Amino acid sequence: MGFPILSLITFLPILGMIIILFLPKEQSKTVKWLSLAITFAQVILACVLLANYNYNAAGVFDEKSFQFIEKFRWINITGISWLGTVKIDYFLGIDGISTPMVLLTAIISFIATLSSWSIEKSVKGFFALFLLLDTGMMGVFVALDFFLFYIFWELMLLPMYFLIGIWGGPRKEYAAIKFFIYTLLGSVFILLVMIGLYFSTTETMADGTKVFTFNLLAMMNPANSAPDGILSILNPSNLRFIAYIALFAGFAIKIPMFPFHTWLPDAHVEAPTPISVILAGVLLKMGTYGILRINYPIFPEITRQLMWWIALFGMINIIYGALVALAQKDFKKLIAYSSVSHMGYVLLGMASLTATGINGAIFQMFNHGTITAMLFLIVGVIYDRAHTRGLNDFGGLATQMPVYTGFVTVAFFAAIGLPSMSGFISETFVFLGAFSINSIRIIAIVSTLGILLGACYMLWTLQRIFFGPLNEKWATLPDLDKREYAMLVPLAAIIFFLGIYPSAMINVMNKSVNTLVMLVTKGL
């Protein structure tokens, strides 16, 4: 097994949380610095993973080609007559689909910790919950056992509920409850399908006996299907189709995909800035990651049937999100709806079932994480100074806050997809993949309207806030401080680096994506 680096990067925040709980509440500075050190250590560990990553290993369904594997028997219960042996493994590993998400989670968690420096209310509680949330997010991207995946998935629910419900805005309770109900509903769908797949998948033990398993890789291989399993690929039925829809819906709520999106604007508007950064930067990606990791390889025949519908919902997300963003007068709500729109590009790329399109989709997941995190930080900077997010309340800030204006311009142009910035590459790959498939070409053509609408609402927002005469009310607003530089400079650097040298990320993904496409389109 070697050094358990995946366990370390996943559970290090839990260790930090335990230490924080034993610290006196008066030591708020110590709590903040400890949290920052923990999340910075995660960034270092993620970089170590990337530096030692083997680009030629595929992963996806082959355990031997996953990297940094940690696997041992975690739960083993025998003697239950109707269940037989219950076997659950502690099984972690990464491939080209999960590695970019591990890196993204580490980076965004560190940036969000910096953004949390202004938190003064119940500092111990905030950072303890934040670090617990961090472990849940990281665990989702490294777990290869469905039961373990589900534990990490659920682990995020309560911390996020309390982080919004306690430290949020005026309507924080409503937003937190709405988030909780939507996410819990999705979790119920995922749980039901997980149980069905468990009783439809067997694994051969050392003594030759077969037992049911939660192993995700075993679920992808038809050779492990139980002939009489309700969701067995050897026993095709409408139940497999229903299970696919239920599982997809469970993940779609987190994306969020229209019409499951209504919790997101409320959660973003009421959440404190660091939690909006985490929500947009990482949590939304978990939905599309779950579809790629579980739906696609376990139900390949249904994925092929529904690719047109996935593309259609991607198009709806793109255009609907952009149109609603165009109508917003609240800066934060505008960015929230722009997230709905940009996650539509991920769905469109995934729907193409091509290596180009899915590479673009995963790259878009990473790029959206960094760009949208930067956008929410930008909203937080101006709100901390002016205590308003009304787009029509400002004007002429470019002369008063020139450095801030520069960072806003970078983030806005990256969101639009300007060449030399990371968003351009991922969106180009998405459309190349979608245009290459006859059945979804019309959908891809209509979806390009989202690019035009995105440019409209971003440039109009830029004009309203930063150009024209300066509102005298804001004549004394200070420009960025050192902490804000530390938050924004790394994200801007990543945006330009991946825009100029996208191969740094695409090379990590490509082998795994090719293998996934082969599995979904041709089978094992």
Question: Each predicted region: which residue ranges?
Answer:
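Short phosphate-coordinating micro-motif centered on Lys-Gly-acidic
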Residues: E154
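Transmembrane helix-loop-helix hairpins at membrane boundaries of multipass inner-membrane proteins
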Residues: M1-I5, L23-L114, S118-A128, T209-V211, ...
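Alpha-helical transmembrane segments and their helix-start/interface "positive-inside/aromatic belt" motifs
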Residues: K29-A41, Y174-G186, M401-G406, K482-P490
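Short hydrophobic alpha-helical membrane-embedded segments
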Residues: I9-L12, V102-L103, K124-L133, V340
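N-terminal signal-anchor/start-transfer transmembrane helix
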Residues: I9-Q27, A249-A252, P256
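Hydrophobic transmembrane alpha-helices and their helix-loop junctions in integral membrane proteins
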Residues: I111-W117, T135-F147, Y161-Q463
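Hydrophobic alpha-helical membrane-insertion segments
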Residues: A37-A57, T183-F199, V408-A415, L452, ...
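Cytoplasmic/organellar membrane-interface segments at the starts of transmembrane helices
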Residues: A271, M401-V403, M458-L524
